[in-house]
Swiss-Prot record:
Function noted in UniProt: Plays a major role in protein secretion by helping the post-translocational extracellular folding of several secreted proteins.
Protein name: Foldase protein PrsA 2
Residue stretches making up the PpiC domain: 146-241
Cellular location(s): Cell membrane
Lineage: Bacteria, Bacillati, Bacillota, Bacilli, Lactobacillales
Main location: membrane
Signal sequence bounds: 1-22
Catalyzed reactions per annotation: [protein]-peptidylproline (omega=180) = [protein]-peptidylproline (omega=0)
Length: 309
């Protein structure tokens, strides 16, 4: 959901600017910094920063967060957020906090990011479920679908470690499963996964590679990017089992529907339509002309978003 990740980035960037902007009207003379012969107030800081790109993104993210919390707060539980957080933490093991810090995140801000992502995902999926799915849509999804497969997957933080492991599995008589258990950085040392081409808990690059391999074949090094924390990981996979694909798409109709609906999360136009609907329902009005254009991407054709007087 790269489009949404771009929007949500502002939740943790320049949060201070947004906080200050919220209290600017009543505390605009509050002193933030003092020096000989001068001071810097909340108003000074707000006026200096509000036109920056980061401030624009931060305000947009704050608006979306407030709107979706109001409309969908009870649709995402703390348990779901913790589960998603733990899943990523387990993936990176002991280096997770370092990875977060390198991305400008803390555990708390990353959890906020996860929560907002899930709120928007819920809204997008609900809207997608109400869309009519044609036979053409089903057939296209079927053509791209690979049914259940089992693979041994090892993961690395460093490309050089992945290269060393690749050389090891290429050696004559090498035991891929044993090497994977020894070398993978997964916190629980899990290496065996069963999934289909619609899997979303594994990196998309890994799923695509596995879908394209024949049973018994091994990949080269696969580079995956986690857009939430802008971190690359490296993977080597071996497909050990693949189910035979049935000839009739109707045999997979329920699963194909899930995949089509989930695919809407990657459609920026559909996302924008859902967000625009939520913003319209919330009757969002921009009061400061500095932020007049932050909702432009969600406006209907020929509709402008002027600042309110």
């Amino acid at each position: 959901m790269k489009q949404m990740n771009k929007l949500i980035t502002g939740v943790v960037t320049l949060a201070t600017v947004v906080t200050l902007s919220a209290c600017q009207s009543s505390h605009n003379n509050t002193k933030l910094v003092s020096m000989k012969g001068d001071t810097i107030t909340v108003s000074d800081f707000y006026n200096e920063t509000k036109n920056t790109e980061l401030a624009q993104k931060a305000m947009l993210s704050l608006v979306i967060s407030r709107v979706f919390e109001t409309q969908y707060a009870n649709k995402v539980s703390d348990k779901e957020v913790e589960k998603a957080y733990k899943q990523t933490a387990d993936q990176y093991g002991t280096s997770f906090k370092t990875v977060l810090a390198q991305s400008g995140l803390t555990p708390e801000t990353y959890k906020k990011q996860i929560r907002l992502t899930k709120l928007v995902e819920y809204a997008v999926k609900e809207q997608a479920k109400n869309e009519t799915i044609s036979k053409k849509d089903y057939r296209q999804a079927y053509d791209a679908y690979t049914p259940t497969m089992t693979a041994e997957i090892m993961q690395f933080e460093k490309e050089e470690d992945a290269k060393a492991a690749l050389e090891a599995v290429k050696a004559e008589g090498a035991d891929f499963a044993a090497i994977a258990k020894e070398k993978t950085i997964a916190a629980d040392k899990k290496t065996t996964y069963t999934f289909d081409s619609g899997e979303t808990t594994l990196p998309a690059e890994v799923v695509r590679a596995a879908s394209g391999l024949k049973e018994g074949n091994r990949s080269e090094i696969i580079t995956a990017l986690d857009p939430a924390i802008s971190k690359r990981t490296y993977h080597i996979i071996k497909v050990t089992k693949k189910a035979t694909k049935k000839a009739d798409w109707k045999a997979y109709q329920k699963r194909l529907k899930d995949i089509i609906v989930t695919g809407k999360l990657k459609d920026p136009d559909f996302q924008n339509k859902v967000i625009a609907k939520a913003l319209d329902k919330a009757n969002v009005k921009i009061k400061d002309k500095a932020f007049a254009n932050i909702l432009a991407q969600f406006a209907k054709p020929n509709q402008k978003q002027p600042a309110q007087k």
